[in-house]
């Protein structure tokens, strides 16, 4: 299953979710491939890697069809395709391609080639609405849209328009992140999603905790840095919820 984690708006916990959800699924002995598809490469650095030291990145696979699959092995069940600064230039090259259908399916075709044997592939998509976002959408079986307050709903609207314009049908779910029950903006978002789209909103809410922030700054997931924290509990809960939904779908 390919899950793209995206929002048009940055700063909503997108990369944090890709990293810690992947780690949580790996703890459940699911084989997981993380894909850093954002030119900021924050997922790569959160995983404790220096982008400059990564010889084979997602950009390599975009340019070399015969590139041997050489992901970074983070632990027994968790792997990473590192990001690359070159993704900005790659995006412009995609936009200039003669065949637009080929341009938006580059990532999908890469993951089809290298993804065999993985239970989950988590794509950390770039913010915005350009070719990188479109590739993340076209590749996805499901999308997770992290949101930290009602201001992020604007980004959701733009993603919805992209999906409709391209006639795509990924299953989309909203994830409330960086939640602080003391703040009215956070509570307004939670109340709105529960009232307006309960079936599309994960029951799990990711609380705002210092452990989550510090874990990423130290190149670790929350289970390495603060295994008994609220953040660890929340991402474990999310992983179980996603795995449960997949099991229910496979029974149908």
Q: Model-predicted segments: where are they?
A:
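P-loop NTP-binding core
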Residues: 1-252
